[in-house]
């Protein structure tokens, strides 16, 4: 009888173990199978009244006049808050012109509904300082909103941060007309928001628009939440060049949720460094544990892009999103002058319309081996696209070289209407199709 009871207990323990295993398998996990921390499940908005005293800029020498640049007075407000232990810098209703602003520890930015923090269109209002741009740690023009080494920095409110980028765009296209091979840095342009070496950052509800260059750039940051932002720049009648919505650059633990992005470049770009020895440079690095969910993408060059200034991206999860006018859903830029590894990237539960479903090709713009004799290799591994219902022009937009290696791709539960439905299975080693229908035909 004793042995019988022991047998029953053993069976129950095995059963419980299997149930727990199934429970873990059904929980939210990153593409590599690791459990998503509860931090990602918390999308509670910050109440700015709990962040300290409010410092309305109009109480500290700033006038409600949209025609004059008031950088000094606004910066003085930030500095006053810092001297008093911190607080929230408030942009009230009205339009306030400014050059580069530098936030200090324990200071925050809040733009009320009807308030506009508008960037100056004079590049001299953006000081040249140590910075990070296009995968390089160099001196460059400051952004409109700058935060360096500020843990807990927040931007809140239902107002607008406007880059006032029109003259910068015109200057860029004029230069490109004069020299079609000009680089993106030949025309001096400021970013809208640059956040560097800041942890526990949260941006919520704000509208970022009309940036002169990248709309928001996060470099060497951990634990960043970007919630319910609207990020826009025009693609017609004039194109706003290089106005990426969100650039993630050597960051870990990033949640992008509930955002609308429509820009004349990539919506979300994963960066991290470029060049033949980029992986040896301590200022470069990987992006890990990035979740993009419940977002909508209007016009953009790609909804999600790895590269081109990127060396290692891992555990990237994009889900439950709608794309209405993206040129590409997923773009893996294989840069032949940079060692790259893109791994454990999952795109799932997507609806809408794009030009190219998946786009993988060498990115040769400004190619430079800088004297390196051998070409570094680029790898993409464990890429999954599933539960997707899309209309597109091109289903399988891929071309690789001998220096690119694609392995372990899975396409599952895909329903595609495509003008060009051709595909070449030999491009990828370890390619799996599960219930993939293109123009009503099952692909195996």
Residue ranges and their predicted role:
Residues 2-5, 12-90, 95-197, 202-204, ...:
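Extracellular "leader-to-stem" segments immediately downstream of a signal peptide or signal-anchor
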Residues 8, 49, 81-83, 101, ...:
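A generic structural signal for short, solvent-exposed coil/turn residues
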Residues 22-33, 106, 176-180, 209, ...:
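Short charge-dense sequence patches
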Residues 37, 92, 378-379, 391-392:
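Proline-rich low-complexity regions
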Residues 51, 132-145, 182-191, 240-246, ...:
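Glycine-rich, flexible loop segments associated with nucleotide phosphate handling
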Residues 100-103, 116, 120-121, 143-148, ...:
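Glycine-rich beta-solenoid repeat tracts in large extracellular/virion proteins
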Residues 113-114, 151-160, 199-210, 222-235, ...:
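Right-handed parallel beta-helix
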Residues 130-132, 361, 387:
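Mature catalytic domains of secreted/periplasmic carbohydrate-active enzymes
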